[in-house]
């Protein structure tokens, strides 16, 4: 009932009721995903007719991803990497923008590591032309559109450094198994901006664990908790555990309702950019992203795509 009321509240006031995400977790713990499908279908916006893709940094001659694989497994690798120039721009950005080390915002210094994870502010990221270009990319938008079978909303960009700091996997750095539930339906596209191998923190997923009735009630009854490798290993076949490695510039899309985690780093540092898409904004109430320095092309794009960019707050755009 509370989530239903929040749906009505969202349509009137353009935000969810407080603690809607907690209510979603409680529902998920009870029905193992059935209600999420209902609310997604209730709130989703009819998708537009597919047109020829023109605005993209990728080559146009083949699809970036297998929609069937993404639906079946809960994740899928993109067939093309980001070009070297774009990767270099993003890496440079990660050395010139300040990031949060758990106590304060600092420039990342690999010679002075004090935490497992260094997070960049989404409002800083949204105002960078290299990230605006990816947000506008029609190939990436179409991945979310296909997965939702509806028009997507861009939720937020996220970027962070991971380090080998500490002796045990960090819950705060998402290095224990968990699932995400801030929206009723969402998709994340992850870009590795450094080479990622067994030593420096590959993502791990439990294949197909995004599906209805895919999670054991014994784990769901714990609520929104991190789960150790040993405990979760009691419930899934070893073949279901997948490790995603890749060279810098490689990317994959994932429904992080799957059980997933980042592996603890042994050496080196890992830089990841994540683009978040949602079918609706029901769930956690994040502040709208403050766009202060849009490029001319980003201004025009946002004017033409007001639904996709409804989570943005523009300053002096018009």
Protein language model regions, located:
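Non-heme Fe(II)-dependent double-stranded beta-helix
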Residues: 3-11, 16-72, 78-175
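Non-heme Fe(II)/2-oxoglutarate
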Residues: 12, 18, 23-25, 53-55, ...
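Glycine-rich nucleotide phosphate-binding loop and flanking beta-alpha elements
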Residues: 84, 183, 260
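Active-site region of the double-stranded beta-helix
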Residues: 150, 175-182, 193-202, 208-211
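A short secondary-structure junction signal
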Residues: 156, 170-173, 187-188, 199-206, ...
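A short beta-loop-beta micro-motif enriched in histidine and acidic residues
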Residues: 175-185, 239-240, 246, 268
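Short, conserved beta-strand element in jelly-roll/cupin
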Residues: 182-198, 245-246, 276-279
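Double-stranded beta-helix
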Residues: 198-258
């Amino acid at each position: 009932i509370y989530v239903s009321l929040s749906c009505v509240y969202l349509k009137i006031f353009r935000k969810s009721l407080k603690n809607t995400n907690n209510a979603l977790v409680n529902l998920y713990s009870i029905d193992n995903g059935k209600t999420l499908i209902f609310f997604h279908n209730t709130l989703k916006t009819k998708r537009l007719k597919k047109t020829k893709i023109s605005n993209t940094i990728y080559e146009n001659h083949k699809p970036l991803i297998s929609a069937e694989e993404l639906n079946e497994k809960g994740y899928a690798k993109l067939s093309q990497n980001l070009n070297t120039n774009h990767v270099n721009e993003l890496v440079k950005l990660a050395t010139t923008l300040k990031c949060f080390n758990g106590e304060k915002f600092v420039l990342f210094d690999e010679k002075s590591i004090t935490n497992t994870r260094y997070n960049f502010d989404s409002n800083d990221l949204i105002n960078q032309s290299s990230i605006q270009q990816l947000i506008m990319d029609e190939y990436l938008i179409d991945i979310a559109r296909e997965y939702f079978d509806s028009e997507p909303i861009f939720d937020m960009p996220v970027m962070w450094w991971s380090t080998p700091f500490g002796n045990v996997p960090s819950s705060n750095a998402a290095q224990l198994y968990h699932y995400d539930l801030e929206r009723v339906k969402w998709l994340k596209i992850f870009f590795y901006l450094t080479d990622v191998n067994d030593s420096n923190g590959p993502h791990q997923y439990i294949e197909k664990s995004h599906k209805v009735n895919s999670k054991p009630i014994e784990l769901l009854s714990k609520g929104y908790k991190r789960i150790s490798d040993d405990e979760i290993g009691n419930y899934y076949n070893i073949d279901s555990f997948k490790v995603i490695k890749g060279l810098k510039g490689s990317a994959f899309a994932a429904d992080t309702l799957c059980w997933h985690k980042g592996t603890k780093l042994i050496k080196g540092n890992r830089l990841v950019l994540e683009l978040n898409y949602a079918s609706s904004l029901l769930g956690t109430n994040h502040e709208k992203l403050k766009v202060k320095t849009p490029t001319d092309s980003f201004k025009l794009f946002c004017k033409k795509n007001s639904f996709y960019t409804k989570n943005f707050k523009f300053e002096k755009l018009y």
